Amino acid sequence: LHNYRNNPCVVMWSIGNEVPTQCSPVGYKVAKFLQDICHREDPTRPVTCGMDQVTCVLANGFAAMIDIPGLNYRANRYQEAYDKLPQNLILGSETASTVSSRGVYKFPVKDKKSAQYDDHQCSSYDVEACSWSNIPDEDFALADDHHWTIGQFVWTGFDYLGEPSPYDTDAWPNHSSMFGIIDLASLPKDRYYLYRSIWNKEA
């Protein structure tokens, strides 16, 4: 906190992401303890936490206590969270996790969850996601339809080694994730241009 609190790039602090204590009786206390430290050391910025256990955190007060409640995926539960929480806003602390391979196009083109193919690739049409994630269109629709969604952090900007979903149980020869907007060679996938068209109106 001390190292970065004077940096204008810092807009909020995060006290965790998908912490295992979200549903435990001590989770609320630990989160409040950490948030209080952030408030004490930097009273100018709010605090968030990336939460993936939506049922728990809405019921046990965990999400209601955080300055900016961040939901990881669960786009279908944003409205429920907004209705139940006092903050009147929701942050997409992890969004999309769409899976795609650059330059690979699968037919027929339709939305699919956890689709697998013999070539261990995913379609570049950006219509495939994991069982727990979604495609970018859902996040864009939330932002367009609800003023109380204040932004999103996409998982992920770049592919990375590890988590080769949807092939994590039959990974060979996959070593790389397929979540990235940009692949391991630093080349943009089709999704890069989709995000750019939404976020950069000058492009």
Language-model features: locations:
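Extended substrate-binding grooves/exosites of carbohydrate-active enzymes
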Residues: 1-203
